[in-house]
Amino acid sequence: MLHNFEDLRGRVGSAEPKTVAVACAHDGHTLEAVLRAAQEGILRYILIGHADEILSVGRTLGCEIDPATVINADTDEDAARIAVELILDGRADFLQKGLMQTATILKAVVNKQTGIGIGRPMSHVALLEVPGYAKLLGVTDGGMMPNPDLEGKKAIVRNAVEMFHALGYEEPLLSALCAAENVSPKIIETVDAAALKQAALGGEFGRCILEGPISLDLALDAESAKIKGYESPVTGKTDILVVPSMSAGNIMVKALIEFAGAKMAGVVIGAKCPIALNSRSASFEEKYNSLLVCALMSGGKRAGA
């Protein structure tokens, strides 16, 4: 179990440093996060973008960046393409999106000729440190699939389970969230949640326990589940919340950050490597946390949770 991002940092710090390819690295928060992780011995980096700006921002942050670690790219498209090439060439282990549109880097990732897609849907996982909750909490998918059907939700679950296995969890606990716990043909997400549970029981997602349909309060609070007579191994212990739509996930994550003071990491999974993907306006801390997650997923020491 990972209780918080400090726990995660400890695991990353005990592993061999990985290399991140940063597309459009000429951004203060992005570069600050990368440089801090590098100074701590957590990772190495290759910075792609406007070379002069990257070196200048580095100096502003008090760091003289070695020009040998910088690759100039005149456009966002060039930066994304070069970053993906570094993954294919084995020179980098994972990607980070810098000061560019999300669509630009994803277009390079899924390019059928030159990309790093693996022929299955990609999805986003927000990993949150929420005050009052005993461990890190995943929320998926609040960033990639707007209204997934059952097959889309299966891909989302599969990606999330693989991510948590890579983070060291032997048997992650998932809750397929709905407004209520009963299956109703009129509420399609309850039907899908029940189908996901059956798929998990059949071993479709690998080793995990998935409950659904289940409401948010029961997923996160064992006492609420006890009062309502809802018995499941996940109540009060959920590792991953599977939301019914991108909007639901996006709103939930932002509410936890704004009102509960949650800390976040954002990762896209389902390609040949994880992608640290945050809003361009995301804080230094969020981008740093995302690097930690990707570094551990990229081959750090694994431990049972």
Q: What positions do the PLM features span?
A:
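Anion-binding alpha/beta catalytic cores of soluble intermediary-metabolism enzymes, centered on
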Residues: 1-47, 51-234, 239-305
